[in-house]
Amino acid sequence: MFNFLRNKIYKIDKNGNKKRVFFIRGVHFSFKGKNSVVEIHEPLAKFDRCRIVCGNNCFVSIGSSPYRVKRLRVLTNGDNSSVKIGKDFSLTNTCEIITTPEKNLNVSIGDNCQFGLYICIRATDGHKIISLEDGTVLNKGKDVVIGNHCWVASNFKILKGSTIASGSVVGMSSVVAGKCDTPNSVYAGNPAKLKKTNITWDRECP
């Protein structure tokens, strides 16, 4: 309970009013430091076996949603990091969003995004690659941005410094390791490449 007193969890209603809570059904919280804030907007998503881990001075926000969010893992152990997920987010099963162990990293996911199975979003590689010539770290972490209304299919991975433009569809088993910056497009492959433009999508089965 001590760590919960040094950090804050809020439910936020439709009018923006905050209520401090110590429990949200379907979400396990683990605070490794102090001064972190988690905000979950109402109406709450249907959380199922989700976990949020925060270090020092971290911020996590999840928007309101009528959809199921199953096995979301938000790992922001690195200090001064943030993860923001917009409203109407859905997750079929298992997504890890990782900013740890580096500091000052951010992941942003826009509104009305649909994620499939086994998604991995990494703002950091987790281990150093070092130049033998001068000792420089060659693979420092970078922010990740996913726009609004993106459909991300199963077994997808997005790596540090990558972006996905709004309205995009990313195919199964794709790896995004750069800028997918053409809106309303289909991307697929490893690395993900532009396959089709001028599209939109919805959640209904054809």
Please tell me what each predicted stretch does.
Residues 162, 174, 180:
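Short beta-to-alpha loop/turn elements within the nucleotide-binding domains of ABC transporters
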